[in-house]
């Protein structure tokens, strides 16, 4: 039976619940608490009628309720299997030369493209896997900010050639644009950025729901294996940053890399990892600690498009588990704030803009009852961090509070090398 047919049948026969969200606490994991009325089930749109544009137009709480109802129905049925898996020659990707020129290719051409770039992989390689399409200014801006941040960090550049967007209506500041603008000769590049634009082939919410995470992740993992074998890029310099559903794809890619090589990738950073709606029976799926040497996650729409489920060695919850973030009006923009926050930390001098402390809720953070040591969300996160961390953020850029974290009741551990590997 078609997965969508099963999904609709489940919606008629079963009832589910929306999540408790009032407590703003991590332990509250979207558990069912009541029943949907027959009228509510009847009024629910078909999955193929839901678009990212509609989710953006809806009030955040309303959109979150809809997404959570769909998620619970999918979990109760246990019959929704993934069926959408774009092939490597359908997934667009791009990288940049040291002068900022964009080089376009498809995923199946990654190795050939890398081999044409001088000194590719001699230093750090960051693979950015997008998880949402560039269908709005918020989506476009978030991705551009992250790309520009890495190019500034690696190549000393701010503006991506040929990609200047109109950000006149977007919140931005010098914290997202380094003050160290290039003067004269470009510095020698100290890293490479590869963007795997999976979001470009996630055309609608249905594609996201039915994405075959393990199959797509295995394809990306195989490409990374080839990058090591044929382009001499060692695993210890490969970091993945991934957005939404792509965070789980990154986990699958890293597991495939380990299966094929016996080695683990250095780091995976998840930017608001999403819920997982479809899965094959008796099959593990999703990002988890152990997929890389270090896995960190930033949750900015935990009760909306994202998930409260822990995804890494350390999970950061700005303003506590929430539907949205300060300064956002919808769950799409809230989810993308994780990308904006990471971008802010990538730029030189901003890596400690987001101090956090171990806590279970924003209230506990405010009451200074968090346990454990202080930490920094983003690129400077210590690789030995574990647990859940809470912090406060600003509504506009610069988003990081920048002030030192409050002194906690207990402090333990010694910093063992923060941020990117040497």
UniProtKB/Swiss-Prot annotation:
Of the GO CC terms on this record, one is: extracellular space
Q: Which UniProt keywords apply?
A: Secreted, Signal
Which residues does UniProt assign to the signal peptide? 1-20
Q: What is its main location?
A: secreted
Question: Where are the bilayer-spanning segments?
Answer: none
Gene Ontology BP terms: lipid catabolic process
Q: Does the keyword Signal feature in the UniProt annotation?
A: yes
Q: State the tissue distribution.
A: Synthesized in the fat body and ovarian follicle cells and accumulate in the oocyte.
- Recorded GO MF terms: lipase activity; serine hydrolase activity
Checking InterPro entries in the record gives: AB_hydrolase_fold, Lipase, TAG_lipase
Q: Can the keyword Secreted be found in this entry's annotation?
A: yes
Q: Where in the cell is it found?
A: Secreted
Q: What induces it?
A: By beta-ecdysone; in males.
**Known role:** Vitellogenin is the major yolk protein of eggs where it is used as a food source during embryogenesis.
Report the protein name in the record.
Vitellogenin-2
Q: Which organism is it from?
A: Ceratitis capitata (Mediterranean fruit fly)
Q: Which gene encodes it?
A: VG2-delta
């Amino acid at each position: 039976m078609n997965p969508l047919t099963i999904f609709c049948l489940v919606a008629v026969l079963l009832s589910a619940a929306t999540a408790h969200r009032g407590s703003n606490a991590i332990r509250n994991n979207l558990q069912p608490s009541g029943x949907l009325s027959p009228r509510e089930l009847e009024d629910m749109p078909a999955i193929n009628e839901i678009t990212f544009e509609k989710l953006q137009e809806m009030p955040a709480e309303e959109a979150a309720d809809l997404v959570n109802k769909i998620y619970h129905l999918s979990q109760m049925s246990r019959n929704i299997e993934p069926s959408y898996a774009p092939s490597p020659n359908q997934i667009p990707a791009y990288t940049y030369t040291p002068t900022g020129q964009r080089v376009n290719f498809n995923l199946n051409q990654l190795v050939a493209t890398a081999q044409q770039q001088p000194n590719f992989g001699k230093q750090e390689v960051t693979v950015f896997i997008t998880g949402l399409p560039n269908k709005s200014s918020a989506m476009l801006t978030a991705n551009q900010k992250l790309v520009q941040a890495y190019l500034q960090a690696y190549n000393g550049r701010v503006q991506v050639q040929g990609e200047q967007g109109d950000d006149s209506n977007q919140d931005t500041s010098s914290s997202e644009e380094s003050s160290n603008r290039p003067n004269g000769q470009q510095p020698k590049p100290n890293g490479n950025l590869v963007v795997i634009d999976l979001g470009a082939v996630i055309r609608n919410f249905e594609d996201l729901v039915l994405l075959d995470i393990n199959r797509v992740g295995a394809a990306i993992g195989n490409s990374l294996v080839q990058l090591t074998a044929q382009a001499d890029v060692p695993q210890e310099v490969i970091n993945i940053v991934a957005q939404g559903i792509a965070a789980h794809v990154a986990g699958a890619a890293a597991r495939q890399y380990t299966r094929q090589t016996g080695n683990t990738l250095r780091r995976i950073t998840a930017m608001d990892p999403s819920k997982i709606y479809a899965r094959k029976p008796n099959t593990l799926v999703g990002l988890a600690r152990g997929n890389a040497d270090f896995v960190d996650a930033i949750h900015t729409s935990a009760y909306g498009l994202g998930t409260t489920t822990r995804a890494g060695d350390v999970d950061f919850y700005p303003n506590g588990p929430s539907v949205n973030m300060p300064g956002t009006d919808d769950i799409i923009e809230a989810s993308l704030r994780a990308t904006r926050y990471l971008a802010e930390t990538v730029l030189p001098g901003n890596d400690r803009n987001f101090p956090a402390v171990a806590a279970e809720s924003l209230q506990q953070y405010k009451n200074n009852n968090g346990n454990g040591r202080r930490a920094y969300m983003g690129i400077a996160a210590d690789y030995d961090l574990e647990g859940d961390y809470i912090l406060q953020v600003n509504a506009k850029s610069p988003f990081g509070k920048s002030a030192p974290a409050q002194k906690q009741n207990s402090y333990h551990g010694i910093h063992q090398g923060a941020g990117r590997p040497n």
